[in-house]
């Protein structure tokens, strides 16, 4: 990918070290992912996008490992994701736990998410039954403020 896009500074990778989604979990993920980081560092990727916890679920599942260890081993930006609220995002940034915070699912049901976060407006919950359905319903029909 780095050759196709003209260098690692234009490429990132998404990692889900603690997810159980689709039975892809590992009983001991820390050595696997620390080794992966060691292997990808020479490519000078721009970022790692890390799903912290179980995808779309528990942020601190049993068997967790210190994701900050993963962050500090990587030689690029650390993008954190998974059920972040505005408060959690602010705390993570203030404590320098991540370089960037992702709000995946809230963007689906809140096309104006940034404005809602800035003004303290309530968020429209997404309808997971419409995820990956291939239809406009549930993706582009949520109201904006």
Annotate each PLM feature:
Residues 2-145:
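Flavin-dependent oxidoreductase catalytic cores
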